Amino acid sequence: MRRPMVAGNWKMHGTRASVAELIEGLGKQVLPGSVDIAVMPASLFTNQVIEGLRATSIIVGAQDAAIQAEQGALTGEIASSQLADAGCKLVLVGHSERRQLIGEQDDVLNKKFAAIQASGLTPVLCIGETLEERKAGQTLEVVGRQLDSVIAEFGVSALINAVIAYEPVWAIGTGLTASPQEAQEVHAAIRAHLAKENAEVAQGVRLLYGGSVKAANAVELFSMPDIDGGLIGGASLNADEFGAICRAAGN
């Protein structure tokens, strides 16, 4: 039985004051003990969030990490070993905004994936198609290719200690979302793709859905057999909304 996970990606949002307010709100939430719950603030606020949530069950992660595990001469970057030292537990890799807006390619993302695991952290590998690719019927081809990049480099067993987040690019920050059935179809295809390599890994790895999940649609999305939780964007900036999503995952 895969343990559900809900991870909140705060993206490039927050001030010390607004983060403190959000921490306070999260501390008041009744959260299910059956769900792994994480938030990923902007790195500037990592220590504030870790300290503020210490009395809760919420773990803290990061939105990105450098291509090398150890600290060194890489201006502007944060090493995964530094994130681990700060108390982070997981790190996003390959988020669509990094792929689309920053132009990160698979070779760079593979280095980050390896560095994150080398530091004892859990990579949350983000995969997904653009609207153009979806219209062209290339969804499964695209997500398969993104998965295969990691599998070819490290073997499918590397995904045992990872989480996969399917995030259709066209549904991020747009208010659009795949129907539960559409999301399930892709999640099932991802699991089948992994099963060709290793059935045990395919059944064990958690697949999160990351396309405009809200409290209003979370219950139905999370009821799908191959959706093990959500990677939450804008809704994670509202403590009550995020709490409701976490409770939906616990049901």
UniProtKB/Swiss-Prot annotation:
Principal cellular location given in the protein's record: cytoplasm
Catalytic positions are H95 (electrophile), E167 (proton acceptor)
Query: Which GO biological-process labels does this protein carry?
Result: gluconeogenesis; glyceraldehyde-3-phosphate biosynthetic process; glycerol catabolic process; glycolytic process
Q: Which InterPro entries match?
A: Aldolase_TIM, TIM_sf, TrioseP_Isoase_bac/euk, Triosephosphate_isomerase, Triosephosphate_isomerase_AS
Q: Where does this one sit in the cell?
A: Cytoplasm
Q: Which UniProt keywords apply?
A: Cytoplasm, Gluconeogenesis, Glycolysis, Isomerase
Catalytic reaction(s) noted: D-glyceraldehyde 3-phosphate = dihydroxyacetone phosphate
Q: Which EC numbers characterise this protein's activity in its record? A: 5.3.1.1
One GO cellular component term of this record is:
cytosol
State whether keyword Membrane applies: no
User: This protein's superkingdom?
Assistant: Bacteria
Task: List the GO molecular function terms.
Answer: triose-phosphate isomerase activity
The pathway to which it is assigned is: Carbohydrate biosynthesis; gluconeogenesis; Carbohydrate degradation; glycolysis; D-glyceraldehyde 3-phosphate from glycerone phosphate: step 1/1
Which residues are involved in binding substrate? N9, W10, K11, G173, S212, G233, G234
Q: Which family does it belong to?
A: Belongs to the triosephosphate isomerase family.
How the protein assembles, per its UniProt entry?
Homodimer.
Quote the function comment for this protein: Involved in the gluconeogenesis. Catalyzes stereospecifically the conversion of dihydroxyacetone phosphate (DHAP) to D-glyceraldehyde-3-phosphate (G3P).
Protein name stated in the entry: Triosephosphate isomerase
Question: Per the UniProt entry, what species is this protein from, by scientific name?
Answer: Pseudomonas savastanoi pv. phaseolicola (strain 1448A / Race 6) (Pseudomonas syringae pv. phaseolicola (strain 1448A / Race 6))
Gene designation: tpiA
